[in-house]
Amino acid sequence: MRGAGYHTLNLERRSKSDSMTESRRLVYQTLNNENPVRVPRHVWDIQWTYEHFPQEIKKLREEYPDDIVWCPRFLKSDSGCEGDPYAVGTYVDEWGCVFENKFEGIIGEVKQAQITSEEWEETEQIAVPKAFLDLDVEAINEYCKQAGQFVLAGSSVRIFERIQFLAGTEKTLMDLYMDPDSMQPAIQKVHKFFCEELKAWAQTDVDALFIQDDWGTQISLLISPELWREIFKPLYREYAEIARTYKKKIFMHSDGYILDIIPDLIEIGIDALNSQIFCMGLEKLEQFRGKITFWGEIDRQQVLPFGDSEEVEQAVKSVKEHLWKDGGCIAQCDFGVGVNPYNVFKVFETWGKLV
């Protein structure tokens, strides 16, 4: 299987003690369906978590430490970002997109689009964040060496969402259906940059590259599967090929109902997928068991905020029943706004009893 030999090689190259390599070994065994001794853990938290539940998150980290971590975005020059993306107010990201946030703990919406004309060809309006290509490789590699866990790249690749941030969601979706060819200059400029960014991260000691795009509503894709395959699948294929070229794994996140494109993600070589598996239905996802690793989750809309102990336990058992096959599941769980902290503990307690 892809990555098995690289796993052993990288453990030796990073020269960690046996105790420091256990987390990485677990994740690779899970990705390769090699029957790990337990399920790898990954908690997703935000600043809100530490402000509202400091003792709970501290205890959780002590009792159920992560096996997967994000590498900080070590850059040699300033990113150009201004403000806090999760705080109330205005935030300017690395592309110069201005976000207005009215609620603490979640990223806001783009306030003003950069591509305001009817001509997508005017790509000079798109200023790519070149600072994101000038990685501090020494700092990244040192982080990977000291971390002990499976390390994900701090990459910012989100081709569909970035086009929306630059042009606005309404214009993006309308033109995808009415005149998709006109969008190609902008899409290709952003895509070329993202390929360069992934290649930069792939030449560090991180274990996996990371890409993300929210493709679904709660009941369907935002665009037709056919249109997705025509325009975006080739781009994701190239991202996955970069990972293979540099012998890295590749992880992807996408919210919403994306069942229709999961076979495509498997085909192009996505190793692990974080998605809203409960809105798609575990029974429907069972057909993909053993073909891709389900990187979480547990229902963060109903079960984590409102469920009782038995409901949380049953949710975890259902994931194990339908999606586990000698691996292929990561115990990922959100500890964000509105989540009951006791339910997060119950998630990992239950996984610990099952695997």
Language-model segments: residues:
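A contiguous, low-structure linker/loop signature
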Residues: C81-P129, Q146-F150
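Active-site loop segments of alpha/beta catalytic cores
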Residues: R2-E51, E56, V92, N101, ...
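An N-terminal domain-start capping segment
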Residues: Y64-P72, K111-I126, S155-L166
